[in-house]
């Protein structure tokens, strides 16, 4: 027999956790004072008037470093749960994780040889 009442706590939590943010936005929209003026329309930079043009171009080097960082950050996110349950999972999962790390190392070596990590 299918017992759906076992999921009542889950559905109650889901509904309550969805209703609370919606209510917070609605209440803040109703209670917040509406004031428009030149101060509200101006940009704000650490308490001072902004100087210069806001559109700055970053060098492509920053993007390459950021991309390599994101790749290895995601690797850490994937490998941490695996490391925490290593003794339960067995050798086959170890081999899969090893292949995953080797693919990322090959990608790092490729980026290194192509000069993506060179600053000059």
UniProtKB/Swiss-Prot annotation:
NDH shuttles electrons from NAD(P)H:plastoquinone, via FMN and iron-sulfur (Fe-S) centers, to quinones in the photosynthetic chain and possibly in a chloroplast respiratory chain. The immediate electron acceptor for the enzyme in this species is believed to be plastoquinone. Couples the redox reaction to proton translocation, and thus conserves the redox energy in a proton gradient. It is found in: Plastid, Chloroplast thylakoid membrane. It is a multi-pass membrane protein. It comes from Nandina domestica. Keywords: Chloroplast, Membrane, NAD, NADP, Plastid, Plastoquinone, Quinone, Thylakoid, Translocase, Transmembrane, Transmembrane helix, Transport. It comes from the Eukaryota. This is NAD(P)H-quinone oxidoreductase subunit 3, chloroplastic. Its EC number is 7.1.1.-. It is an enzyme of class 7 (translocase). The chain crosses the membrane at residues 9-29, 64-84, 88-108.
């Amino acid at each position: 027999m299918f017992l759906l009442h076992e999921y009542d706590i889950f559905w109650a939590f889901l509904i309550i956790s969805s209703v609370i943010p919606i209510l917070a936005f609605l209440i803040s929209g109703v209670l917040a004072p509406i004031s428009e003026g030149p101060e509200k329309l101006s940009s704000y930079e650490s308490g001072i008037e902004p100087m210069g043009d806001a559109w700055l171009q970053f060098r492509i080097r920053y993007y390459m470093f950021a991309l390599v960082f994101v790749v290895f950050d995601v690797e850490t996110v994937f490998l941490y749960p695996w490391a925490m349950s290593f003794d339960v999972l067995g050798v086959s999962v170890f081999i899969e994780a090893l292949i995953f790390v080797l693919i990322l190392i090959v990608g790092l070596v490729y980026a290194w040889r192509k000069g993506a990590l060179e600053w000059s």
